[in-house]
């Protein structure tokens, strides 16, 4: 359910495989309202309908820019965008215009990033790296992006140099929900010390 906030200056959307999140934004970058919706749709018409189901309260009388990252730019998404090869800056100089049937929407997609060796790709995570670099533009090192498919990205001189994906989150979910370990894992409590140790090991040997 979207918060009611008419007249957002623009809308940001992160479209994942299992759902999407949307933010009503001011011209100065302030988050005015947030919403989330279900995914599992294909084609521009279905994506537009899904977005309108949560973002309609934010639309004014004119055209509202909508900037979308993630799976909406993949095959079967709103529109397929070309890949950008590494090394490259997290964000392209230009977004990709997407078809929109509602006259209140002006939709643009952020292209994803690919790597040939080893073969890998990201759609959506590049925007998080861009956000991190906006706060620390001189950063040189490895950025970890936890999630269903965790990504580790080597960043240097404002560019993504290389990256690698691990199915950490998905494997953990499968073990907890569907494996023979389910009864014992369900009873486990969070262990902050073990977490800190794991983070320390990862930082020392990225």
Language-model-detected regions and their locations in the chain:
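Short glycine-rich, Thr/Ser-proximal phosphate-binding strand/loop in the N-terminal lobe
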Residues: 10-49
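A short acidic Gly-Thr/Ser loop motif
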Residues: 13-19, 71, 145-149, 168
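Short glycine-/acidic-enriched loop or helix-start segments at secondary-structure transitions
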Residues: 22, 77-79, 153-155
């Amino acid at each position: 359910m979207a918060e009611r906030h008419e007249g957002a200056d623009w809308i940001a959307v992160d479209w994942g495989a299992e759902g999407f999140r949307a933010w009503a934004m001011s011209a100065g970058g302030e988050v005015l309202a947030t919403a989330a919706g279900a995914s599992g749709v294909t084609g521009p018409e279905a994506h537009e309908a899904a977005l309108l189901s949560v973002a309609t309260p934010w639309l004014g009388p004119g055209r509202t820019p909508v900037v979308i990252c993630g799976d909406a730019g993949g095959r079967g998404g709103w529109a397929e965008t070309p890949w950008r090869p590494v090394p490259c800056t997290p964000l392209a100089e230009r977004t990709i215009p997407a078809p929109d049937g509602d006259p209140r929407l002006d939709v643009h997609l952020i292209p994803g990033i690919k790597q040939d060796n080893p073969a890998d790709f990201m759609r959506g995570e590049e925007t998080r790296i861009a956000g991190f670099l906006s706060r620390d533009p001189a950063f040189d090192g490895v950025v970890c992006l936890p999630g269903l498919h965790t990504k580790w990205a080597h960043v240097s001189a404002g560019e993504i140099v290389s990256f690698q994906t691990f199915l950490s989150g998905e494997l953990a979910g499968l073990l907890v929900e569907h494996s023979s370990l389910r009864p014992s894992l369900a009873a486990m409590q969070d262990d902050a010390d073990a977490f800190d140790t794991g983070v320390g090991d990862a930082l020392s040997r990225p």
